[in-house]
Amino acid sequence: MASSSTAFYLKDAGFHIRNVPKEWNDWNLFHIFQVFGRVGYCRVAGQSNDMQLGFVNMLSAADAEEVRKNLHDGNLIGDNYSLKVSDHKNIGGALLPMASISVQKLLSSPPAKSGPVHLSSSWLPLNKDIEVEVVDYLPSSSAAKDVFALTILRINDAQSNEKYNAMHEKMNSYAQLVAFDSELQIGYDGVFRESPRSIKRVRRISATKLYLVDFGKIINYEKSKCFQIPKVFQTIPTRVSFCGLDGLTWSEQAIPSFDNIREVVQKWGAMENATLHAVTCGFAGAINMINLFCGNSVLAERLQRKGICEYLPRHQQPRFAYSRDSLLKHTNAGVTAHISNDADVVKDLLKKIDGVKSMLRELDL
């Protein structure tokens, strides 16, 4: 392969693009030309109008010739694009940009050193009925030993689907640019090359297993297919959510069987003829506390009938969780407290406050 400096000065291997879409960056242009061969340099230069200028230099004359074979009257046409391409073979090499980015240099440069990455877990909306699927369990240190936790995946949500699909499209483009071979620490996150053109975000959960944090599946760990996750893909939380069943108190005898119970619950979700639904009632630390049901079948009630736990529905519990929207609505309603100068009214108010304090002490709140 030619060196990056050779590629820069290689005669008759450069192209000038006059109408790069304004929303494109270097990598968009790179992926158009890498179909025809090895790209040495690729640069998009912003312009004040709706289009940008682009500069591409292929790594060999043969690679450049493949580009020329696909030009039609100076146009490179493909899915959803039509680029006006000037061939440096015809106009000379003087237009080669000195500020071009070396793709080969980017590919060969080691990633910036940083600490291990841990993606944030996905929060579910309060008091909202959503469609979900119970997926493979993602172990977490967030759950106490006596808390029965599940991992669920939100489904049939167009807005969420669009966000994650867009992220994975960018990740799959990134997969073409880096060499994968990194040691992931157990309990931390990275990306996994599933196929030559597809990567997925993962967490290493054991010496031999990875967890697909956006799909809810466990796969085998292969060091040669792993890479530290780029910072740009760390901002979106995992698509799976860590959940507990609200209102359940478990017997000591049931706790060692949590793994088996999780398997039964996952099969229950898969066997139901209708879609599972979840409503988040509140939060316990980093855990979404949910009611999980399918039609008239409520999971917590089914487990209670097995005699392995006690179930206290949310409306019977002493504490309540209110949604952020409800609190904002109340705050914005313009209701303000008026201070009274009447001594008797103030004394009565203080008595009520003392009564509330006593009640809270009795409830150990």
Swiss-Prot record:
Gene3D superfamilies: 3.30.70.330. It comes from the Eukaryota. One of its GO terms (cellular component) is cytoplasm. InterPro entries: Nucleotide-bd_a/b_plait_sf, RBD_domain_sf, RRM_dom. GO terms for molecular function: mRNA binding. One of its GO terms (biological process) is cell division. Residues 13-90 form the RRM domain. Keywords: Cell cycle, Cell division, Developmental protein, RNA-binding. Required maternally for early embryonic cell divisions. May have a role in DNA replication. This is Embryonic developmental protein tofu-6. It comes from Caenorhabditis briggsae. The gene is tofu-6.
